[in-house]
UniProtKB/Swiss-Prot annotation:
Interacts with PEX7. This is Peroxisomal protein PEX21. Belongs to the peroxin-21 family. The gene is PEX21. Its main location: cytoplasm. Keywords: Cytoplasm, Peroxisome, Protein transport, Thioester bond, Transport, Ubl conjugation. GO terms for biological process: protein transport. Mediates peroxisomal import of proteins containing a C-terminal PTS2-type peroxisomal targeting signal via its interaction with PEX7. Interaction with PEX7 only takes place when PEX7 is associated with cargo proteins containing a PTS2 peroxisomal targeting signal. PEX7 along with PTS2-containing cargo proteins are then translocated through the PEX13-PEX14 docking complex together with PEX21. InterPro entries: PEX18_PEX21_C (IPR056940). It comes from Candida glabrata (strain ATCC 2001 / BCRC 20586 / JCM 3761 / NBRC 0622 / NRRL Y-65 / CBS 138).
Length: 232
């Protein structure tokens, strides 16, 4: 049977060849398997234990300085954090104990008087029988409304008077036009009568006939000025 197929693992380790398997380890195997003597095994076993202890001790010494340095660094950082926290707390306490004096601030007596004034105004405004949320203040009509209405009425009266005056002027102009047409028609009738008369030549030489001729042609007009008539 091959050495790799052996049932006992210790036997496989002993059968391997290498720098780490010496005669002492073989003797340990013999001791465990019952083929060796107890007096020969005790001393090598002690050597293996001492070597293992020394190896572990050297490993601990290699790791211990780094661990110590990390712990020391953490201790310093913790100390700085605690000191910073203490400084912050002291700053907060100092800030909270500060008293600011504003020279523009009102005096306490003035504040109390103003508070009493506000309470008095509140009690005078809100009725005692009605809740505050149901109070509806009465709205008084301003006096300026009447003045605006009066001013509007005066302005309307002035506009009406102006319109009346314009209508009177138009009526006068229409009346003058009617009179002008009436006088013109009368002048035309007078001219026609004079032309049919036997005294036509004599009437045509008169100034009145010449005026009537101008009125009939529209070159002149007759306007009534009171009781008199004016030819223009």
């Amino acid at each position: 049977m091959s050495q790799y197929c052996a049932a006992d693992p210790i036997q496989r380790m002993v059968s391997r060849k290498g720098p780490y398997l010496d005669t002492q380890q073989q003797r340990v195997y013999k001791h465990r398997s019952g083929t060796g003597h107890g007096t020969n095994i005790r001393q090598p076993t002690t050597g293996i234990v001492e070597a293992t202890f020394l190896q572990n001790n050297s490993g601990m010494n290699a790791v211990h300085p780094t661990t110590l340095n990390v712990q020391t660094h953490n201790a310093h950082a913790t100390g700085r954090t605690i000191a910073k926290s203490v400084d912050t707390n002291s700053w907060v306490n100092d800030f909270s104990s500060m008293k600011v004096q504003d020279p523009l601030e009102f005096a306490d007596s003035y504040k109390n008087l103003y508070k009493q004034y506000e309470q008095k105004q509140f009690h005078n405004t809100v009725p005692a029988q009605c809740p505050r949320n149901l109070y509806i203040p009465t709205v008084t009509r301003p006096q300026t409304t009447l003045n605006i209405v009066d001013h509007h009425e005066d302005k309307s009266s002035a506009v009406d008077q102006l319109i009346d005056d314009e209508f009177e002027k138009i009526e006068e102009e229409v009346k003058d036009q009617n009179q002008k047409l009436e006088f013109q028609e009368s002048a035309q009738s007078f001219i026609e009568i004079c032309e049919r008369s036997q005294m036509k030549e004599k009437l045509q030489r008169s100034k009145f006939f010449q005026v009537m001729q101008k009125v009939s042609d529209g070159e002149a007009t007759i306007r009534q000025d009171g009781e008199n008539y004016v030819i223009r």
